[in-house]
Amino acid sequence: MSVVNRRIAVYPGTFDPITNGHIDLVSRAAPLFESIVVGVAQSPSKGPSLPLQQRVTLAREALCQHENVQVIGFDTLLAHFVRHVGAGVLLRGLRAVSDFEYEFQMASMNRHLIPEVETLFLTPAEQHSFISSSLVREIARLGGDVSGFAPAAVVAALRQNL
């Protein structure tokens, strides 16, 4: 078992793209931890619409007001990444009951792979509970206005890449 720091949390995701819901979760979690590492996953199986480095850059811009938050891209197993940064907590968001089954399965697998790390679930603020990266991408792809769901830099990146 690795030595972990429960004051360091990893918030993993594809962040394709980062949304106001993700930003809200990090903003509310930031005071709870000494450090939050936002881990932007390569996730080739998901076929991200934005390249990894661009997703990292957009997340850094969106979260730059938090001194204790860093954004790092990774292309390894999440368990390896968590151990690499020495985190003792995995942060996950639960928007609705529909998220629960998948998140419960992932938390159980992570508990098996990294038993020294706890998974902490946070729910979004009500105004962000319906936002998902896939919906934001789809609305943007079809020419809809996503400015209420993501930062301006993300909106511009989606317009350019979709």
UniProtKB/Swiss-Prot annotation:
Its EC number is 2.7.7.3. It is an enzyme of class 2 (transferase). Substrate binds at T14, K46, L78, R92. The keyword Nucleotidyltransferase applies. One of its GO terms (biological process) is coenzyme A biosynthetic process. It catalyses: (R)-4'-phosphopantetheine + ATP + H(+) = 3'-dephospho-CoA + diphosphate. GO terms for molecular function: ATP binding; pantetheine-phosphate adenylyltransferase activity. Transmembrane segments: none annotated. The keyword ATP-binding applies. Pathway: Cofactor biosynthesis; coenzyme A biosynthesis; CoA from (R)-pantothenate: step 4/5. Its cofactor is Mg(2+). It is found in: Cytoplasm. Keywords: ATP-binding, Coenzyme A biosynthesis, Cytoplasm, Magnesium, Nucleotide-binding, Nucleotidyltransferase, Transferase. ATP binds at T14, F15, H22, G93, L94, R95, E103, H128, S129, F130, I131, S132, S133, S134. GO terms for cellular component: cytoplasm. CDD domains: PPAT (cd02163). Pfam families: CTP_transf_like. The record marks H22 as: Transition state stabilizer. PANTHER family: PHOSPHOPANTETHEINE ADENYLYLTRANSFERASE (PTHR21342:SF1). Reversibly transfers an adenylyl group from ATP to 4'-phosphopantetheine, yielding dephospho-CoA (dPCoA) and pyrophosphate. Homohexamer. Belongs to the bacterial CoaD family. This is Phosphopantetheine adenylyltransferase. It comes from Xylella fastidiosa (strain M12).
